[in-house]
């Protein structure tokens, strides 16, 4: 992502005959966000996930497709910046299976810029590796390391 553009020059210096690039807002076309709503993910973790999603929308002009799942896809919500503050409606509470999210993305033809997965990793049923970059944002210390994607440990109790 580039913070500057020549298509809209910086007007501050134009009267001096100096042409500098203007700032442009960072834009990501679409982000898919999988939220693990299984029984092992508590309200504190879901609250932290919501805060992180709000921060993403505040920083980037994007569309978030939020996929709530436990052992299956339970619900999907779509958000944009104008939807802040976010009101997530997580549904779930059963066991955990990551594979249905991958199938849902394929079945619905979503090709997001990246996939962000909020989870406690208390599951070993991983989907096929997606075509887009994947970041596992993990609450707590549980679970095995995913076979692909980047891993980010979120601070518990934050």
Predicted feature descriptions by range:
Residues 1-32, 41-44:
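Acidic, polar low-complexity linker/tail segments
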Residues 8, 84, 89, 111, ...:
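Intrinsic-disorder/low-complexity coil detector
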Residues 15-18, 75-78, 126, 146:
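Short, solvent-exposed polar/charged micro-motifs at secondary-structure junctions
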Residues 25-83, 88-91, 100-119, 123, ...:
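Von Willebrand factor
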Residues 65, 122-158:
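VWA/integrin I-like adhesion module and closely mimicked acidic/polar interface patches used
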Residues 95-96:
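Conserved blade-ending motifs and adjacent loop-strand segments that build the rim/top face
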């Amino acid at each position: 992502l580039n913070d500057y553009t020549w298509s809209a020059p910086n007007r501050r210096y134009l009267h001096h005959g100096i042409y500098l690039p203007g700032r442009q807002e960072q834009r990501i076309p679409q982000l898919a966000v999988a939220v693990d709503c299984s029984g092992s993910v508590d309200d504190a973790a879901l609250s932290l996930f919501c805060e992180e999603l709000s921060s993403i929308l505040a920083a980037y002009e994007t569309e978030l497709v939020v996929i709530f799942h436990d052992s299956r896809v339970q619900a999907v919500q779509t958000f944009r910046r104008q939807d802040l503050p976010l009101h997530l409606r997580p549904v779930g509470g059963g066991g955990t299976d990551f594979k249905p999210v991958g199938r849902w993305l394929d079945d619905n033809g979503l090709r997001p810029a990246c996939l962000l997965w909020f989870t406690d990793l208390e599951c070993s049923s991983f989907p096929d590796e997606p075509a887009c970059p994947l970041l596992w944002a993990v609450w707590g210390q549980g679970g095995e390391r995913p076979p692909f994607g980047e891993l980010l440990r979120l601070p518990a109790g934050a």
